[in-house]
């Protein structure tokens, strides 16, 4: 979609792009094997690149990085155990959407939604990776 709409945004001298990424790249999560985390990392870096490359043309691009968000996704994907995570870990989808819109309108490149998710992302940077991976493995075993 960016490829399709970016040229007209450049011609108009104005545009806003939101890419829905995830908290996953910021925290260790061995249960997200495969391509999920790498794709989300790409979305974040892609958003940063578009934002910086086209900022002088009036275009802002934001990567919105929510944690667990209440939608039908987890149940439809057969991730029933994730859907049973404690309520305090979840965000409302309307809140995530509103925060994402506010972020792009204010020129913020990366948004980690919610205080708890920001705390998790910061904590993952501070704790040695060997410890955070061990914690993630333990939590994953409990959930499945």
Protein language model regions, located:
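Active-site helix of classical SDR
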Residues: 2, 38-39
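C-terminal helical subdomain
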Residues: 63, 83-121
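Residue(s) in the substrate-gating loop at a strand-loop-helix junction
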Residues: 22
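Active-site loop immediately N-terminal to the catalytic Tyr-X3-Lys motif
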Residues: 27-34
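A short, exposed helix-loop element centered on a Lys and neighboring polar residues
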Residues: 2-3, 48
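Short, flexible catalytic-loop segment of classical short-chain dehydrogenase/reductase
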Residues: 66-76, 80-81
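Conserved catalytic Lys-bearing alpha helix of Rossmann-like short-chain dehydrogenase/reductases
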Residues: 39-47, 61
């Amino acid at each position: 979609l960016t490829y399709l709409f970016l040229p007209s945004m450049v011609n108009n001298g104005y545009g806003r792009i939101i890419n829905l990424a995830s908290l996953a790249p910021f925290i260790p999560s061995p249960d997200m094997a495969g391509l999920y985390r790498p794709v989300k990392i790409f979305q974040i870096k892609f958003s940063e690149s578009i934002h910086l490359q086209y900022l002088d043309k009036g275009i802002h691009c934001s990567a919105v990085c929510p944690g667990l968000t209440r939608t039908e996704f987890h149940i439809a994907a057969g991730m029933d155990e994730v859907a049973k995570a404690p309520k305090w870990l979840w965000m409302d989808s309307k809140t995530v959407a509103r925060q994402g819109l506010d972020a792009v309108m204010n020129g913020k490149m990366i948004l980690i939604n919610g205080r708890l998710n920001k705390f998790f992302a910061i904590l993952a940077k501070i704790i040695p990776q060997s410890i955070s991976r061990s914690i993630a493995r333990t939590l994953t075993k409990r959930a499945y």
